[in-house]
Amino acid sequence: MFGIMAYKGGDRMIRVAICDDDKHMQESLSKYLLDYSIQCDREIDHAEFDTCEELMDEYLKGNSFDVILLDIEFKNNDEKQMNGIELGKRLRGLYANDNTAIVYVTSYGEYAIDSIKIRPYDYIKKPITYERIVEFFETYYLDQAKRKKVFEYTAHKVKNSIIVSNICYFES
């Protein structure tokens, strides 16, 4: 199942994917996103997915997300169906996608070691609280702001600027 909701706020809109086979969890996360966006004046667009395959199809269509709130274990998970670890590997490997913050939302802590190569941004242990969602998104927004810092300089009487994270080295 796929659904999209947008919440208007003060910052650049971020796109969030919720991928969980538990409808109650999807609804809780959606409500937390709405509450957070209103309370903190953030602009969030989100989509819900019941399976990893549905989310992967979105990427195959050329769509992407800034944040993925991703379960690891899915009911009726046969050998042909992806779990959250496999989806993370595909996104990081096939698409060389390091920009998406993959956040595992799970009851299964034993997968933490398996996910190291995927470089998850965070783990949120179920049951989830609104406070934990706020903590995650505030950290995420701070990290994004740090990446957008600009270095300004003048060369040959022309003012220039460059995003600090794009600077490899300085020469004098």
Residue map of PLM features:
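CheY-like receiver
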Residues: 65-147
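A generic structural motif
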Residues: 37-46, 98-100
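Conserved acidic segment of CheY-like receiver
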Residues: 14-25, 29-33
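Conserved SAM-binding loop
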Residues: 18, 48, 104-105
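Short, well-ordered amphipathic alpha-helices
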Residues: 27-36, 55, 87-92
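Short, Lys/Arg-enriched N-terminal segments with co-localized hydrophobic residues
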Residues: 1-12
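Acidic, metal-coordinating helix/loop segments flanking the phosphotransfer/catalytic sites
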Residues: 30, 48-67
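Conserved binding/recognition cores within well-folded domains
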Residues: 135-172
